[in-house]
Amino acid sequence: SKYESEGVARSEELQEVHQAFADAGRKPI
């Protein structure tokens, strides 16, 4: 359904953000 695909897209987006923070935490700035 429309809402399901929207939720999947949002979930993937959150995973990317989480990964970005994880990478930032591992590397000294």
Curated annotation (Swiss-Prot):
GO CC terms of this entry: myofibril; myosin complex; myosin filament
Write out the GO MF terms: actin binding; ATP binding; calmodulin binding
Q: Where in this protein does the record put region Disordered? A: 1-29
Q: Does the keyword Glycoprotein apply?
A: no
From the Swiss-Prot or TrEMBL record, state where the protein is found. Answer: Cytoplasm, Myofibril
Q: State the protein's purpose.
A: Muscle contraction.
The entry describes its oligomerization and partners as: Muscle myosin is a hexameric protein that consists of 2 heavy chain subunits (MHC), 2 alkali light chain subunits (MLC) and 2 regulatory light chain subunits (MLC-2).
Q: What does the UniProt entry state concerning the protein's domains?
A: Limited proteolysis of myosin heavy chain produces 1 light meromyosin (LMM) and 1 heavy meromyosin (HMM). HMM can be further cleaved into 2 globular subfragments (S1) and 1 rod-shaped subfragment (S2).
The protein's name is Myosin heavy chain, muscle
* Source organism: Bombyx mori
Q: What is the lineage of its organism?
A: Eukaryota, Metazoa, Ecdysozoa, Arthropoda, Hexapoda
